[in-house]
C-alpha cells in the first residue's frame, strides 16, 4: 500500500517551530495549492486548497528560514488525527507529514507592509 503526496504551493505564513520536551524540533506551516477548471458556461474558475504541513527534526530547523509567500515543493504522507478542542468538541485534522521540502522560489523579507 502507498501513502504518498506531492504538493507544490505557496507558504500561507512563516513556519512555526517548537521543541518538544524530549528535545525534538517540530514545525508546522500552511501551504496553498491552486487548481483551475472551466465551469459549465466555459469560464475559467480557480480554487485554492489549504494544507497543514508538519516537519520534524532537521527538516523543521531548515524550514524555519522560509517565509510567507515562498513557492515550495513538499513530499510526504497524509496523516489523520483527532483531538478535543477547548469546548470539548472532537475535531478531525488531516496533516501532510513531510519528509522532503524544497524551496522553489526565493522571496526576501520586505520592510514594506502590504
What function would you assign to each model-found segment?
Residues 1-3, 15-24, 38-44, 61-64, ...:
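Acidic, gly/ser/pro-rich intrinsically disordered tails
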Residues 6-13, 31, 68-80, 98-101:
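OB-fold and OB-like beta-barrel modules that bind single-stranded nucleic acids
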Residues 12, 56, 104:
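Residue-level recognition of the GNAT/N-acetyltransferase active site
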Residues 19-33, 92-94:
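Short aromatic-glycine-enriched beta-strand elements
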Residues 32, 38, 52-54:
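Double-stranded beta-helix
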Residues 43-52:
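Short, basic/aromatic beta-hairpin or loop at an interaction surface
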Residues 53-91:
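Beta-rich strand-turn-strand
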Amino acid at each position: 500500500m502507498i501513502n504518498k503526496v506531492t504538493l507544490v504551493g505557496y507558504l500561507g505564513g512563516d513556519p512555526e517551530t517548537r521543541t518538544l520536551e524530549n528535545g525534538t524540533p517540530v514545525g508546522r506551516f500552511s501551504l496553498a495549492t491552486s487548481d483551475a477548471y472551466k465551469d459549465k458556461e466555459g469560464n475559467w474558475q480557480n480554487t485554492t486548497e489549504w494544507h497543514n504541513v508538519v516537519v520534524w527534526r532537521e527538516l523543521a530547523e531548515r524550514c524555519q528560514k522560509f517565509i510567507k509567500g515562498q513557492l515550495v515543493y513538499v513530499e510526504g504522507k497524509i496523516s489523520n488525527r483527532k483531538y478535543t478542542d477547548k469546548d470539548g468538541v472532537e475535531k478531525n485534522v488531516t496533516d501532510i507529514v513531510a519528509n522532503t521540502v524544497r524551496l522553489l522560489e526565493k522571496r526576501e523579507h520586505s520592510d514594506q507592509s502590504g
